[in-house]
Amino acid sequence: MAWHSPGRLVFAIAFIGTTLGFSFTASAQSGIASVYTGGRTANGERLQPGALTAAHRTLPFGTMVRVTDNRSGRSIVVRINDRGPFVAGRVIDLTPAGAHALGFSGLTNVTLDVVGRS
């Protein structure tokens, strides 16, 4: 089998993608959520602390994500409009409004599920 054959190419792309942290399935992602504030988001919007928006490293802007707090069981749906978090183990940065709706301040363990696009 040559290196450029379709089977090896798919394997190589999947290996590189998973190494870089991309997901090729619709499965949920779990990790730590944090609260953040700031000025402008990566898509050019002004960060609005009262909005249900969030930062994620790889999901496209406009992706709607259900964030479920694993401790309380509360869920919210946020729109991805920024990049981050840039701290190991964290999977999403939420606005203060998102954290308040989930009932936490600081950090919490969450599960993320993509629910659509805005």
Model-based region annotation:
Residues 2-118:
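Secreted/periplasmic proteins
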